[in-house]
A protein has these predicted regions:
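Hydrophobic or amphipathic alpha-helical targeting/insertion segments
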Residues: 1-27
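Surface-exposed, gly/pro-biased binding rims or lids
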Residues: 25-27, 33, 48-56
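Extracytoplasmic
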Residues: 11, 36-38, 87, 98
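Low-complexity, Pro/Ser/Thr- and charge-rich linker/hinge segments at domain boundaries
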Residues: 21-39, 199-215
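Histidine- and aromatic-rich segments of cupredoxin/plastocyanin-like copper-binding domains
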Residues: 43, 49-214
Length: 215
C-alpha cells in the first residue's frame, strides 16, 4: 500500500496492450504492427547515482523523489529507433511520478529555453486516442501537454520525410505554464530520435487516416 511512487521511481511504469481486432472496426485502418509501425513510448524523468568514473550505478530514489534530471523513453536515455517510410502509431504514456511534459516532434536537435521563442516548429501529428479511448475524429496536434499518468495516441506520417532523415521526440519546457515547471534542470531537448528507414516495410502499411474514429 502507498508504495506506487517509490516503485515507479525505482523501476519502470509500463503499459499493456488490450486489443480485440475482431470487434474493433478501426483495427485495420490504423497502424497495428507492434514494434514496426505501432510503437509504445513510456516517457519518464529519472535521477541516477554515479560512481567515480561517471558510470551509472543505480536509480536515485527517496521518500519524496523529485522529477529527475534525465529524460528516458522506454528505459533508454537518448535512444534511436528506425521507423518505416510511412505512417506510424505512437502510443505515449507519461510514466513519471511528478514531471509534466510538453511533447512534440521536431527536426531540430536542441533548444535552449532561455533564448528560444515561439518560432519553434513542431511537426504535425494526428491525435487519435487518449486514456478514455478513441476520439470522435483525428485531431491535428503539434505539441501536447502530458501530466503524470496521461496516455495519448498519435499518428505520425514519416512518409513525408526523406529516407535517412532524423526526427526528434522533443520536450519543450518553455511552452509549459510557469506552475508546471518543477525542475530548473529541464529545458527543451530531444528525448529520442526516429530515423526514417525505407528498408523497414510493414506487412500492411497505412497511407491515410480515417476521417472519423467513432460511428
Amino acid at each position: 500500500m502507498d508504495l506506487t511512487t517509490d516503485q515507479v521511481t525505482r523501476g519502470m511504469a509500463g503499459m499493456m496492450y488490450v486489443q480485440d481486432p475482431n470487434n474493433d472496426p478501426l483495427y485495420s485502418q490504423l497502424p497495428n504492427e507492434y514494434g514496426v509501425n505501432d510503437i509504445p513510448l513510456n516517457i519518464q524523468a529519472k535521477n541516477f547515482n554515479f560512481d567515480d568514473n561517471n558510470n551509472v550505478t543505480s536509480i536515485k530514489a527517496g521518500e519524496k523523489p523529485g522529477p529527475g534530471s534525465w529524460g528516458m523513453v522506454n528505459g533508454v536515455v537518448g535512444g534511436v529507433m528506425h521507423v518505416p517510410h510511412s505512417m506510424v502509431r505512437l502510443r505515449m504514456l507519461n510514466g513519471s511520478t511528478i514531471k509534466v511534459f510538453n511533447i512534440g516532434l521536431t527536426k531540430e536537435l536542441l533548444y535552449d529555453y532561455t533564448t528560444a521563442n515561439d518560432s519553434i516548429r513542431f511537426e504535425r501529428m494526428w491525435m487519435v486516442a487518449t486514456g478514455g479511448g478513441y476520439l470522435d475524429y483525428p485531431r491535428p496536434a503539434r505539441n501536447n501537454l502530458f501530466s503524470p499518468g496521461d496516455r495519448r495516441e498519435f499518428i505520425a506520417d514519416f512518409g513525408q520525410y526523406n529516407p535517412g532523415d532524423t526526427i526528434y521526440l522533443t520536450h519543450f519546457d518553455n511552452k509549459l505554464p510557469a506552475d508546471a515547471k518543477y525542475s530548473k534542470h529541464w529545458y527543451s531537448s530531444a528525448m529520442m530520435a526516429f530515423v526514417v528507414d525505407e528498408t523497414i516495410r510493414p506487412t500492411r502499411p497505412v497511407t491515410s487516416i480515417p476521417a472519423t474514429l467513432k460511428p
